[in-house]
Amino acid sequence: MSETSYNGWPASKDRLAIGIKSYTVPGTTVKLACAEKVAPLLIGFAEEFHKLIEPIDGSNDDWGYCYRMVRGSTDKLSNHSSGTALDLNAGSHALGKIGTFDAAKVPMIRALAKKYGLKWGGDYINRKDEMHFEIALDAAKVATLITKLELDNA
C-alpha cells in the first residue's frame, strides 16, 4: 500500500517517485521543492505572497517538500511529505504563534489561499501555523483550477 499525506496526496521518501521538483519563485531567488502536479498553484501563490503580503526573504526559512510526520505526531504524514505544502518566512511566523502577520494583510492572505485552492495554517482550529499553506483539493480539482487560473504553461 502506498503512503499518503493527510490531504490524500501520494507521499514518499523518494522525491522522484512522487514527482518532486524544485521551482524558483518568480521575482525571487528562492527555490521551493513541490509536487509537479500542484506546482503551478503553490509557486503562483508564493509569487503573489511575495508581491502582496511580504517579501519571501530567502533567508533559508522557506520550505516545500520534506518527508516527515506532522509535528508532534507519530502516525500522521505531513503534507510536506507529498510536496503539497509550503512554509513561507518561517522565522517570522513560528509554529504556534498567533498574530504574526499585520492584521490588515490577513484578509488578503485568506483570499490568496482561496484563489489557489490552499488552506492556511493560520486558520487551523487547534495549533496555529501561520507560515504554512497546503493544497486543500484533490487531483481533479487541482487540474481544473490550474486551467481556470491559466497556469497550464507556468
Residue ranges and their predicted role:
Residues S5, G64-C66, K115:
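Intrinsically disordered, low-complexity N-terminal regions enriched in serine/proline/glycine
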Residues K13, K51-G58, Y116-D123:
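Short secondary-structure junctions
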Residues P10-K13, G27, E36, M69-T74, ...:
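Solvent-exposed, flexible loop/coil residues
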Residues M1-P55:
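Active-site acidic/histidine clusters and adjacent loop/turn architecture
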Residues P40-T84, S92:
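Active-site-adjacent loop/helix surface patches within enzyme catalytic domains
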